[in-house]
Amino acid sequence: MFWRKVIGYWKSILVLSAIAYLSLLREPSIALPSVPGIDKWIHGVMYLILTLTLLWDSQQRPNLWWIAGVFSAIFGGFIEVLQELFFYPRMGDWMDWLADCIGVIIAIVVWLIGMKLYEKRMVK
């Protein structure tokens, strides 16, 4: 039963693993464009994708949407702490975590609006 639930979240686990891997590389091999604030945009988009994936995988429990948001935000903070403590020369940054949380909030708003529109469409 436990493994069946885990397998049901394979997309979320894949996105979560990719974010952890990219965030914990000691020296990222991907050079970011020299656009001011691009790293914050990347953080926001990564956590928007993570949250939407969690919401998609947990559609059977539509009233627990907030758990996807809380989990994503806590995961973002955890990654920042790990970077600061164990992954030199990476540094934890509260502004990165704020960007993560903004991505989470946008994902939840988009999801809830989408679900309302879907429900209205199904009623007609």
Where are these regions (language model features)?
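Membrane-helix interface segments
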Residues: 7-10, 60-67, 90-94
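Short helix-capping/hinge motifs at transmembrane helix termini and TM-loop junctions
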Residues: 25-27, 59, 87-88, 115
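"…centered on the first transmembrane helix and the immediately adjacent amphipathic helix/loop
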Residues: 1-56, 68, 72
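Membrane-embedded catalytic cores of phosphoryl/pyrophosphoryl-handling enzymes
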Residues: 57-62, 66-83
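Interfacial helix-loop-helix junctions of multi-pass membrane proteins
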Residues: 33-37, 79-105
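Membrane-interfacial alpha-helical segments at the cytosolic side of multi-pass membrane proteins
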Residues: 46-60, 104-115
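Residues within alpha-helical transmembrane segments of multi-pass membrane proteins, especially transporters
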Residues: 25, 53, 74, 78, ...
